[in-house]
From Swiss-Prot:
It comes from Homo sapiens. Changing V537I: In a colorectal cancer sample; somatic mutation. Transmembrane segments: none annotated. GO terms for biological process: adult locomotory behavior; dendrite morphogenesis; G protein-coupled receptor signaling pathway; negative regulation of TOR signaling; phosphatidylinositol 3-kinase/protein kinase B signal transduction; regulation of small GTPase mediated signal transduction. Residues 592-671, 677-754 form the PDZ domain. PH domain confers substrate specificity and recognition. Able to discriminate between RAC1, RHOA, and CDC42. DH domain alone was unable to confer substrate specificity and recognition. The lineage of its organism: Eukaryota, Metazoa, Chordata, Craniata, Vertebrata. Residues 390-464, 491-566 form the DEP domain. This is Phosphatidylinositol 3,4,5-trisphosphate-dependent Rac exchanger 2 protein.
Length: 1606
């Protein structure tokens, strides 16, 4: 080697040495810096958590925080801190004043190697600590406490949770070998520290190897470090600094900047790295194996990485025109750069997507959970501090600064000092952290919004005090607002979103950003352009819309933007296959719902696993499962809302065991077929079933444990064929003959012991009555209800027999089938969500109508009975008018009797009706029929959503699974090994009922009007007023007569001896128990009615009140009477004025007890007389006299009042009687009662006569018809939502921080106290005559519906009918109809106490009407436009919704122990009503829609551009108030389908994380492939009357364009 070459070599080695030493300094600096950070973390753990938890454990504030808990969580963390403080001190001494290449640190590690063994205890305890913390995090108070500790410690709350801090010591001890390895690599062999570092490396490896947990961690980190060593040109921090494991790796094609390159991608937790594979020339050499394998090309932090699917065949801007197959886009949001990746196969793409979603789920779930929990904790703490500061008095007050007064504010310095005083914090810096957290979370703010929180003389104010507090999370706010905005934009008759030509290219369905901003401001959504621009950016960030070329953010410029959902709708983004996140159909379902109760620790059935699906293996004879209709071999779809057919079989077993342990009844969705063949073996004990009816005959009852039940025959099934012969049109007797013809055993035994299960509760009750009343063998009247076993042999000749058979084969049609579809989608948080959409025919549909008709018939019968008293009017009717009067009465009463007869007949027919189980839309004119009282096409649309329960307090699909916080695979093994434990799930049910609008208009009357037109406003009210006045007068009259009898009894008993008096009081007069005293002396007191109150239709005037305030004048006279009695009694008994027959003992005196009773009776009597007098003087009586004066020209109201006044002046006359002659009081009272009866009877007759005039038979029939239709649909809709709440599956808004069981309980409390809100949505077009009449009929039906109340009773323990959780009963009159819900005992116990005790509640119906086409230019009547007519309906409904909301707020205010301060009270109620805090915006929108319809047509202005937006907004408004929903159109088919599917998609997007871009895609899938398809099939002859000009939101999506077209 030459001198020159040696010199060059030495120079090069010198450079290498210099570089090596320079890197050594970097490693030493890193060691020192990370050690300082680590000690800081340990100090934070000890001061912020350990010390505070020790204080909490010592004070025993929370039973969950004990000294053992704290020890288990933190182990010997304080000892570790002490060691590391010392270690840090030694390291810093070695590296003083700053690190350089010659300094030595190896000896530091050698000195502390034994002390580091202290980690053994901590690491071995860590797994227990993790499990404990996981359990503690489920307790809300503990979670809040831990977040508070972190906050006061000053750490940013969403960075790292406590579990992250607890794992830090393990990560640190494992990091030392890696640091020492790197240090050794950078230390020359001749360096004085080399040997010490090498020894320290081996020592620290030994320390880690002796600790199992640390060893595992170290091995994982070593693998990552080894991997990084093979990357040439690595940039950025080491992989071990941010990552702990590799999740996925593989070769992908990367398209960026117009180039297609093959790259190797590596996905870690928190990082995506891509490299170029390095080509090696010497493939077999050792150097090539040990050297670099890859060239570093880039890295993306997954925190700023977004992934978007690309459909096969797509070629766009980001793919540089290249066609993408098996590809997806990756967006680096930090640099705003995009590139496209392509996998080799669809399976590989799926694997990458799963890995990316899993990584995002883990990271986002942790962050979202922390954010939500922190916000809740801060808001609660802010409210608590606010109340305390208000009570303090001198902290929050008006303060002056520079001639300006700032109201209700406080000083930052005073706030921190006060927190120290009350012990909320321990150090001033904690107060600063708390103040800043309150400011960042929107609880307080600087009065001029110029400063963060500082403990100085700066003014701050709670946002409660200036109305700027917004309790909702920003992300959900954008989601719900975005969904609302999308629907409104696509509800316009003049679209804002439309195709646009721009630079020689047509862009479909786009809107310019500046035009959208104009629209938002014009609509009132935003006040300024800046606010609108921020909203637009939020929409883009949350996946609603994007720039058409992906080149710009949302700006106030003429830039084209498109909603993602419109791409799906146009078909432009759906060429070949659907995307991963969209709503996909998993399975079509034809099933029936079974209700199975546990009995003696068993449900009575067993399952087996066949092809990964649970199949019924066995059904126990006579069990509840057999009674419900379980059959061997059937597939089970769902149990209690859980889709068990998608679970592993061992999980299904665990799920059933947990249900059995909780004694829950099972709601099982089991597969079935519309038509089945059942083979029943012949038996000596009989076939075990009964049939009823004909054309077709129906299985009336099946015996439990019989051969029929075992074969799979169920009550309600329709018999189509017997032994292959069609009998669907045969008579009842013929069907029985076919069944019995082929049997061997004609006279079965043991029939009395059979326990029958019936088709309906009415059938069961009817049979029970027959069995009790009818002697054996009596077959009279039983032609349509005959037991198969008892058929007479003469029918045998009617059957075609091919010899005797071993079984009877029945082909039957199943009833109450549920047609459904199971969907799945990946939510915005990456969670797999499952949806079951079903369309259900309500059970008990016809029998409920029958019971309502029965109640109406009874009410009419009672009215007819009352009309018999009309003859008393003959005294005041002139002779020449009496014939007219008699003819009028007889004619009207005859019509009433005909109606009563018809209703009873219809009721009988409906009770026996079994097929079909729903009422189809009519296509032909038909005479009046019983089914005309049933709602047409009434179906309940049920959508059940289920997904894994999340870690966030919010509980919505925006979070992720709790277990995703665990980062190692060891937890998965634990999870699979734990038997009986399933990951928690969320189950929520949404119900919407659809029907044809109520109508009493026959199809032949094309130009007829509806009831609202035919009946005047005063007519509607007058009838109710008269009926209520009748009831009040009769009730008051009974009370008066009862008082008279009691006074007679009490005063007559005084004439007996004391001994007899005691007997009398024991025998005739009931003893005064506490309850009776309360009833007589407290409840029956004064009832003073003002004249203007008697027409109040909502409240009973004559009601019991616990107040004597209205009776002072009466009490004076009563008091004087009792005092006179007691003082004059002796002298009176000894006077000569006594009758000769009245021989009384000298010792008789009126006891105080008797005085009290007489006092109470008189007081009650006087109050009733006052009430009756006021009623007789009221406006209703004036109107009745005026209406009937043509029959009594000689006696009008004036004559009646002149005669009444002197005879009913009760207080004056009776006071005189009491003073002058108290012992003649009984006769005075009787005279008064007779006079009252006389006047009441006269008024009663006039009222009845007036009512007879109103009883137009045709109008009332029509009114009853639409009322029945509406009430039946209302009861069915409410029943489904009620059962969802009782099954703890109701939640009207997942935006609130509430579990479903709590939301269900709260809704039940809400309806028990405020009543139930019913939202009726009309899609009728009032410009069409028949639909206008329907709308008018509906208005009157809803008016009558307000008089209905709901009550609840427990049903019988032993059910006679299968799969019916509740039945109905109707009682009362048209003015006060009561519907009773009979509920099984398990569900009855879930009701609020008030309802269990017999309390009821009212219905609050509201109707929002909006045609799906513009009504401009159409007129209703009297120059009132159709738009104005709809606006009047909607304005009245909005007012009712506001009134209901006020009742709701009042209920929560009464329920809450809220503070006296009105502002803080409002804030408290806002928190209690968290789902309702969007109401102000919704009220504003609905009001603006109504106003826009009433203004003059101004098509070019934004104010009129509401379209049909009212439908979706009013629906959301009512939904947030917990309303039941009923959607109506002319047939209940086409328009209802469009609306209900849209509502379901909106609910999924708003509450369950359906990505916003798939709203229309999901709607379209439900319309074309969902459960509603079956409704169209059931009504094939019904014409689709959806307007052609309906907005695009109510149109089907366009099909994809042909291949090759853009």
């Amino acid at each position: 080697m030459s001198e020159d070459s040696r010199g060059d070599s030495r120079a090069e080695s010198a450079k290498d040495l210099e570089k090596q030493l320079r890197l050594r300094v970097c490693v030493l600096s890193e060691l020192q810096k990370t050690e300082r950070d680590y000690v800081g973390t340990l100090e934070f753990l000890v001061s912020a958590f350990l010390h505070r938890m020790n204080q909490c454990a010592a004070s025993k504030v929370d039973k969950n925080v004990t000294e053992e808990t704290v020890k288990m969580l933190f182990s010997n963390i304080e000892d570790i801190l002490a060691v590391h403080k010392e270690f840090l001190k030694v390291v810093e001494e070695c590296l003083h004043p700053e690190p350089n290449a010659q300094q030595e640190v190896g000896t530091c590690f050698l000195h502390f190697k034994d002390k580091f063994r202290i980690y053994d205890e901590y690491c071995s305890n860590h797994e227990k600590a993790q499990k404990l913390l996981l359990e503690l995090n489920k307790i809300r108070t503990i979670r809040t406490f831990l977040l508070n500790c972190m906050l006061l410690g000053g750490r940013k709350n969403t960075d790292v949770p406590l579990e992250g801090y607890l794992v830090t010591p393990i990560q640190r001890i494992c990091k030392y070998p890696l640091i020492l390895k790197e240090l050794l690599k950078r230390t020359p062999r001749k360096h004085s520290d080399y040997a010490a570092v090498m020894e320290a490396l081996q020592a620290m490896k030994a320390v880690c190897s002796n600790i199992n947990e640390a060893k595992r961690q170290m091995e994982k980190l070593e693998v990552l470090e080894e991997w990084q060593s093979h990357i040439e040109g690595w940039e950025g921090s080491n992989i071990t600094d941010t990552c702990t494991e590799m999740l996925m790796c593989g070769v992908l094609l990367k398209i960026s900047s117009g180039n297609i390159q093959e790259r190797v991608f590596f996905l870690f937790d928190n990082l995506l790295v891509y490299c170029k594979r390095k080509h090696r020339r010497l493939k077999n050499s050792k150097a090539s194996t040990d050297g670099h394998r890859y060239l570093f090309r880039g890295r993306i932090n997954t925190e700023v990485m977004e992934v978007e699917n690309v459909d096969d065949g797509t070629a766009d801007f980001h793919s540089s025109g290249h066609i993408v197959v098996n590809g997806w886009k990756i967006h680096n949001t930090a640099k705003n750069k995009w590139f496209v990746c392509m996998a080799k196969t669809p399976e590989e793409k799926h694997e990458w997507f799963e890995a990316i979603l899993k990584e995002r789920e883990r990271r986002k779930g942790l962050k979202l959970g922390m954010e939500q929990d922190t916000w809740v904790m801060i808001s609660e703490q802010g409210e608590k501090l606010y109340k305390m500061m208000c009570r303090q008095g001198n902290l929050i007050k008006d303060r002056k600064r520079k001639l300006t007064t700032f109201p209700k504010c406080f000083l930052g310095s005073e706030f921190v000092s006060w927190l120290l005083e009350i012990g909320e914090i321990h150090r001033p810096e904690e107060g600063v952290h708390l103040g800043q957290a309150l400011l960042e979370n929107g609880i307080i703010h600087h009065v001029t919004d110029k400063h963060q929180f500082k403990p100085e003389q700066m003014l701050y104010r709670f946002r409660y005090d200036d109305g700027t507090f917004y309790p909702r999370n920003e992300m959900q706010d954008v989601i719900s607002k975005g969904v609302r905005l999308y629907c409104r934009l696509h509800s316009l008759f003049t679209p804002v979103i439309r195709d646009k030509d721009y630079h020689l290219r047509t862009y479909k369905s786009v809107v310019m950003a500046n035009k959208l901003i104009d629209w938002l401001i014009a609509q009132g959504d935003c006040r300024t352009r800046e606010e609108a621009m921020i909203f637009g950016v939020g929409l883009c960030d949350n996946g609603f819309m994007h720039h058409v070329l992906e080149k710009s953010e949302f700006k106030d410029e003429p830039l084209l933007f498109r909603f993602f959902s419109d791409e799906e709708m146009e078909g432009s983004n759906m060429k070949h296959r659907l995307m991963k996140h969209d709503l996909k159909v998993v399975e079509n379902v034809i099933a029936k719902s079974l209700l199975i109760k546990s009995n003696e620790g068993s449900y009575g059935f067993g399952l087996e696993d066949k092809n990964k699906v649970p199949i019924i293996k066995l059904v126990e004879k006579g069990s509840n499962a057999e009674m419900a209709g379980m059959e061997v071999g059937k597939k089970i779809f769902a149990i209690n809302g859980d889709l068990v057919f998608m679970r592993p079989f061992n999980e299904v077993d665990c799920f059933l065991k947990s249900c059995l342990n909780s004694r829950k009844p099972l709601r099982v969705l089991v597969s079935t077929k519309p038509r089945e063949t059942v083979k029943i073996p012949d038996s000596a004990d009989g076939l075990g079933f009964q049939i009823r009816g004909f054309g077709p005959s129906v299985v009336h009852a099946v015996g439990r444990g019989t051969v029929a039940a075992a074969a799979g025959l169920h009550p309600g099934q329709c018999i189509i064929k017997v032994n292959g012969i069609n009998v669907s049109k045969e008579t009842h007797a013929s069907v029985i003959a076919h069944v019995t013809a082929c049997r061997k055993y004609r006279r079965p035994t043991k029939q009395d012991s059979i326990q029958w299960v019936y088709n309906s509760i009415e059938s069961a009750q009817e049979d029970l009555q027959k069995s009790h009343s009818k002697p054996p063998g009596d077959e009279a009247g039983d032609a349509f209800d005959c037991k198969v076993e008892e058929v007479i042999d003469k029918f045998n000749t009617m059957a075609i027999i091919d010899g005797k058979k071993e079984h009877v084969s029945l082909t039957v049609d199943n009833v109450h089938l549920e047609y459904g579809v199971v969907y799945e989608y990946d939510s915005t948080a990456g969670i797999k969500c499952n949806v079951v959409e079903k369309m259900i025919e309500p059970k008990g549909f016809f029998s409920l109508t029958a019971k309502i008709l029965e109640a109406l018939a009874k009410s009419d019968e009672h009215f007819v009975q009352n009309c018999t008293s009309l003859n008393s009017l003959n005294e005041v009717i002139p002779t020449d008018l009496q014939s007219k009067f008699s003819a009028l009465c007889s004619e009207r009463i005859e019509h009433l009797c005909q109606r009563i007869s018809s209703y009873k007949k219809f009721s009988r027919v409906l009770k026996n009706r079994a097929w079909p189980t729903f009422k189809q839309a009519k296509s032909k004119i038909s005479p009046l029929h019983s089914s005309d009282f049933c709602p047409t096409n009434c179906h309940v649309n049920v959508m059940e959503v289920s997904y894994p329960k999340t870690s966030t307090s919010l509980g919505s699909a925006f979070g992720v699974q709790l277990d995703s916080r665990k980062h190692n695979s060891h937890d998965k093994e634990n999870k699979s090994s734990e038997q009986g434990k399933l990951s928690p799930m969320v189950y929520i049910q949404h119900t919407i009922t659809t029907m044809a609008a109520p109508s009493g208009l026959s199809l032949g009357q094309q130009d007829g009007h509806g009831l609202r037109y035919l009946l005047k406003e005063e007519d509607l009210e007058t009838q109710d007023i008269y009926q209520k006045l009748l009831g009040k007068l009769q009730t008051a009259l009974k009370e008066v007569e009862m008082c008279v009898c009691q006074i007679d009894d009490l005063l007559s008993s005084i004439t007996y001896s004391p001994k007899l008096e005691r007997k009398t009081s024991e025998g005739i007069i009931p003893t005064d128990s506490d309850n009776e005293k309360g009833e007589r002396n407290s409840k029956r007191v004064c009832f003073n009615v003002a004249g203007d109150e008697q027409e109040d239709s909502g409240h009973d005037t004559i009601s019991n009140r616990d107040s004597y305030s209205d009776c002072n004048s009466n009490r004076n006279s009563i008091a004087s009477f009792t005092s006179i009695c007691s003082s004059q009694c002796s002298s009176y008994f000894h006077s000569d004025e006594m009758d000769s027959g009245d021989e009384l003992p000298l010792s008789v005196r009126i006891s105080h007890d008797k005085q009290d009773k007489i006092h109470s009776c008189l007081e009650h009597l006087f109050s009733q007389v006052d009430s009756i007098t006021n009623l007789l003087k009221g406006q209703a009586v004036v109107r009745a006299f005026d209406q009937t004066k043509y029959l009594t020209p000689g006696r009008g109201l004036q004559e009646f009042q002149q005669e009444m006044e002197p005879k009913l002046s009760c207080p004056k006359r009776l006071r005189l009687h009491i003073k002058q002659d108290p012992w003649n009081l009984p006769s005075s009272v009787r005279t008064l009662a007779q006079n009252i009866r006389k006047f009441v009877e006269e008024v009663k007759c006039r009222l009845l006569l007036a009512l007879l005039e109103y009883s137009d038979s045709e109008t009332q029939l029509r009114r009853d018809m639409v009322f029945c239709q509406t009430l039946v649909a209302t009861v069915c809709a409410f029943s489904e939502q009620l059962m969802a709440a009782l099954n703890q599956m109701f939640d009207n808004s997942k935006e609130n921080e509430m579990e479903t069981w709590e939301a269900s309980r709260r809704w039940l409390d809400q309806i028990a106290n405020a009543g139930v809100l019913f939202h009726f949505q009309s899609l009728l077009s009032p410009n069409l005559t028949d639909e206008q009449a329907m709308l008018e009929d509906t208005l009157v039906a809803l008016f009558d519906l307000e008089k209905v109340s709901f009550y609840f009773k427990p049903s019988e323990e032993e059910p006679l009918v299968a799969n019916v959780p509740l039945t109905y009963q109707a009682e009362g009159s048209r003015q006060a109809l009561k519907v009773y819900f009979y509920i099984d005992s398990y569900h009855f116990e879930q009701l609020p106490q008030r309802l269990k005790n017999g309390g009821g509640f009212k219905i609050h119906p509201v109707l929002f009407a909006q045609a799906l086409e513009s009504m401009e230019g159409y007129y209703y009547r009297d120059n009132v436009s159709v738009e104005e007519f709809q606006a009047q309906i909607n304005a009245a409904s909005l007012e009712k919704v506001k009134q209901y909301n006020q009742k709701l707020r009042a209920f929560y205010l009464d329920k809450s122990n809220s503070p006296p301060n009105s502002t803080s009270k409002a804030a408290y109620v806002d928190k209690l009503m968290r789902p309702l805090n969007a109401l102000d915006e919704l009220y504003r929108l609905v009001a603006s829609f109504i106003r826009s319809k009433r203004t003059a047509a101004c098509a070019n202005t934004a104010c009129s551009a509401s379209g049909v937006g009212l439908l979706s907004v009013s629906s959301e408004l009512c939904n947030r108030l917990g309303a039941c929903h009923i959607i109506m159109c002319s047939s209940g088919v086409h328009r209802c389908t469009l609306s209900v599917t849209l509502e379901q998609a909106i609910i999924l997007a708003r509450s369950h994380g359906l990505p916003p871009r798939y709203i229309m895609q999901a709607t379209d899938v439900m319309r074309k492939q969902g459960a509603r398809v079956q409704n169209t099939a059931k009504n094939l002859g019904v014409r689709d009357r959806t307007p052609q000009s309906a907005p695009r939101l109510y149109k089907l999506c366009e099909p994809p364009p042909p291949a090759g077209e853009e």
